[in-house]
From Swiss-Prot:
ATP binds at K11, F59, R87, T93, R104, N114. Homotetramer. It is found in: Cytoplasm. The active site is at H117 (pros-phosphohistidine intermediate). It catalyses: a 2'-deoxyribonucleoside 5'-diphosphate + ATP = a 2'-deoxyribonucleoside 5'-triphosphate + ADP; a ribonucleoside 5'-diphosphate + ATP = a ribonucleoside 5'-triphosphate + ADP. Its main location: cytoplasm. Major role in the synthesis of nucleoside triphosphates other than ATP. The ATP gamma phosphate is transferred to the NDP beta phosphate via a ping-pong mechanism, using a phosphorylated active-site intermediate. It comes from the Bacteria. Its EC number is 2.7.4.6. This is Nucleoside diphosphate kinase. GO terms for biological process: CTP biosynthetic process; GTP biosynthetic process; UTP biosynthetic process. HAMAP family: NDP_kinase.
């Protein structure tokens, strides 16, 4: 297994619940390192660009509305098998179907307000990381 980078977004619902630290602790306890991070308010244009792959889906407008409803915490995680490890820690998209002990089972309220986003593959991780963080702002450690 190789060292990978993946994007993680702690969404507005989890930021509002003040659980950023608890979520980051789960990543770190699983061996992932935070190598870039910031709290930011997404503009509608940025949210639409980031989720452009879903533009034709019926949930697109609601997703964008939700993602601009409050600040998000974006971070780059690095570690062995980081992409899959992050996805395992997050749990199923629908928190009702997420395994106990996963981030979404513990902190999410609904399929829309589901606490976190994580890249789903190496190709998307590279694009998503670059969307938020120029290479100069990423610091492997």
């Amino acid at each position: 297994m190789s060292v990978e980078r993946t994007l993680s977004i702690i969404k507005p619902d989890a930021v509002a619940k003040n659980v950023i630290g608890q979520i980051i602790a789960r990543f770190e306890n699983a061996g992932l390192k935070v190598i870039a991070a910031r709290l930011q308010q997404l503009s509608r244009a940025d949210a639409e660009r980031f989720y452009a792959v879903h533009k034709e889906r019926p949930f697109f407008k609601d997703l964008v509305d939700f993602m601009v409803s409050g600040p998000v915490f974006v971070q780059v995680l690095e570690g062995e098998g980081a992409i899959q490890k992050n996805r395992d820690l997050m749990g199923a998209t629908d928190p009702k179907k997420a395994a106990p002990g996963t981030i979404r089972a513990d902190f999410a309220d609904s399929i829309d307000a589901n606490a976190v986003h994580g890249s789903d593959a190496a190709e998307t991780a590279a694009v998503e990381v670059a969307f938020f963080f120029p290479e100069i702002n990423i610091h492997s450690r």
